[in-house]
Design a protein with these regions (language model features):
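Switch/connector loops and helix/strand junctions flanking conserved nucleotide-binding motifs
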Residues: 49, 75-79, 186-191
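Walker A/P-loop-proximal flanking segment of P-loop NTPase domains
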Residues: 1-45, 49-59, 128-129
């Protein structure tokens, strides 16, 4: 099948003309994933975020279990903490099946969560999966800013932050790396810790490192694509 240009979605190397970004993927893997970093890829649309995640996932699957999600059509997840937890369990369950994870682990992951404490229950599932699957796990979420103004989403970031900090202290097991991709930098979002006191805020994503990667293309890059 002849290759064609794609400007409307994910670029597939086997199907589309595209700049070779394998060097960029290698640098992300070495400088961020292997170092256990949590980070955000925030760039304007048409900058290749989704394609970068796709190609990064393909590379990482050689050594990691990759949970690749998108909040593109997940508005209904953000009605409550319970709906978010249930939605994530469904989506991650699909990732586990697609990557041929042991059926026993999938059944455990998909078991019912606590109705009263859905986020705590989700956190326990993450711990159990990370301890049992035999591979380090990378979580990727594209279009993450679709619900970035939602308190429910911020609570989920708070859960990831709590587990990351406990893991650093040797008290928990959690994802090797978390990548959030979107137009805006969710690192700047604020979680109100004390509703009765307007002045007290804290960032739920202050564990994230800055992502220093030029995602633009040079004339030489583009020339290589056309040759």
């Amino acid at each position: 099948m002849a290759k064609r240009f794609c400007v409307t979605g994910t670029c597939i190397p086997e199907k589309n003309y595209m700049v070779d970004i394998s060097g960029r993927i290698d640098r992300i893997t070495k400088d961020y994933i292997e170092q256990g970093q949590y980070f955000t890829i925030n760039r304007a649309r048409q900058y290749g975020k989704t394609t970068t995640l796709f190609l990064l996932e393909r590379k990482l699957r050689e050594e990691y279990l990759v949970l690749s999600l998108s909040f593109e059509a997940a508005d209904e997840y953000f009605q409550s903490l319970s709906t978010l937890a249930e939605g994530l369990i469904l989506d991650i369950g699909e990732c586990l099946r697609e990557q041929k994870v042991e059926e026993k682990l999938i059944e455990e992951w998909c078991s019912p969560i606590s109705e009263k404490f859905p986020m705590r229950s989700l956190g326990q599932k993450i711990t159990s999966l990370c301890r049992s699957c035999g591979k380090k796990i990378v979580l990727m979420i594209d279009e993450v800013d679709k619900s970035s103004d939602n308190q429910i989403f911020l609570s989920f970031l708070g859960l990831l932050r709590e587990k990351y900090l406990k893991c650093q202290q040797g008290k928990d097991d959690t994802f090797q790396s978390v990548i959030l991709a979107g137009v805006y930098d969710v690192k700047t979002l604020k979680l109100k810790l004390h509703p009765q006191e307007e002045s007290k805020y804290n960032s739920p994503w202050n564990i994230a490192v800055d992502f220093y990667m030029d995602m633009s293309f040079s004339a030489k890059d583009i020339q290589g694509m056309l040759q």
